[in-house]
Amino acid sequence: MKAAQKGFTLIELMIVVAIIGILAAIAIPAYQDYTARAQLSERMTLASGLKTKVSDIFSQDGSCPANTAATAGIEKDTDINGKYVAKVTTGGTAAASGGCTIVATMKASDVATPLRGKTLTLTLGNADKGSYTWACTSNADNKYLPKTCQTATTTTP
């Protein structure tokens, strides 16, 4: 009588290890991209929080507020920060069509490597046509940008 096999053969174990390796090779980069997008969402949230204030000031006196110091109800640029965002700066050159900018800058450390020091710029436009649009540009790779940053959004003054 033949004894029943107990355990796994070396080939079976090698196949399992190979499958785990393939799954890890797919999952790790996907998780890193997810983490980077989550970090960028903080930047978008902090920058978007200033759109109403900047729009209001532009509507009232046609100027673009600069927040290098606390002014016009907007905190100083380095006071507007987060876990991954170093600062959010407002400014720009006022024109009839807008021109005000909100620039959020990522920290140089403790952030996903492809995002270190990258900026997101929201630019006020279309002001001369009765409604404002905020165009979003960034020097970060497009795959990390939130969908709301990939198209202009309209707000009524």
Curated annotation (Swiss-Prot):
Mode of membrane association: Single-pass membrane protein
Locations listed in the record: Fimbrium; Membrane
GO CC terms of this entry: membrane; periplasmic space; type IV pilus
TM regions (residue ranges): 8-28
A GO BP entry: cell adhesion
SUPFAM superfamilies to which the protein is assigned, alphabetical: Pili subunits (SSF54523)
Gene Ontology MF term list: glycosphingolipid binding
Main location: other
Modification N-methylphenylalanine, positions: F8
Keywords noted in UniProt: Disulfide bond, Fimbrium, Membrane, Methylation, Transmembrane, Transmembrane helix
Pfam families cross-referenced by the UniProt entry: N_methyl (PF07963), Pilin (PF00114)
Disulfide bridge positions per record: C64-C100, C136-C149
Propeptide: 1-7
Entry's family note: Belongs to the N-Me-Phe pilin family.
Oligomer status and interactors: The pili are polar flexible filaments of about 5.4 nanometers diameter and 2.5 micrometers average length; they consist of only a single polypeptide chain arranged in a helical configuration of five subunits per turn in the assembled pilus.
Protein name in the entry: Fimbrial protein
Species for this entry: Pseudomonas aeruginosa
